[in-house]
């Protein structure tokens, strides 16, 4: 059986944070799943919901804030509010974390509610920049997004 750490080690640590991913890497897992959105300034950011209020202390949509503004929101899980590894991070931060690890990364493109312009291309470009094509699975509840991914890169694995 192949086990993925859903949103990192989210049972114990704040979901979709660098801390949750770092702790997941200590486990006997096949891969990590995460969710990606785009900030107002076009950065690929790691967070599950379109709105920040469930996981961070703040209000509003991810798309309405720049990455620097998003970094100012504190995690709302008790005991982790002041941990820098529990802030909204960039996809490239996770790539730097896993690039030398024997791990698969499932990137869920979150554009089923908000249609982020060119998010598929931006994700694929970053994957190529880091030479991580063999470690990546792309998923989405938006079937058109998966079709777009395959059109842009027929070799990338989708699920």
Predicted features and spans:
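Phosphate-group recognition and catalysis centered on beta-loop-alpha active-site segments
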Residues: 1-159
């Amino acid at each position: 059986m192949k086990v993925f750490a859903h949103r990192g080690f989210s049972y114990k640590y704040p979901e979709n944070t660098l801390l949750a991913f770092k702790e997941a890497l200590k486990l006997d897992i096949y891969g990590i799943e995460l969710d990606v959105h785009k900030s107002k300034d076009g950065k690929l950011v790691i967070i599950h919901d379109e709105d920040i209020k469930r996981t961070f202390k703040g209000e509003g949509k991810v798309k309405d804030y720049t990455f620097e503004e998003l970094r100012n929101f504190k995690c709302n899980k008790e005991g982790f509010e002041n941990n820098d590894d529990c802030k909204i991070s960039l996809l490239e931060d996770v790539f730097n974390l896993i690039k030398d690890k024997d791990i698969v990364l499932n990137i869920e493109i979150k554009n089923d509610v908000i249609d982020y312009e060119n998010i598929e291309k931006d994700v694929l470009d970053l994957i190529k920049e880091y030479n991580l094509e063999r470690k990546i699975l792309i998923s989405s509840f938006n079937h058109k997004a998966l079709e777009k991914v395959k059109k842009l890169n027929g070799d990338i694995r989708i699920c």
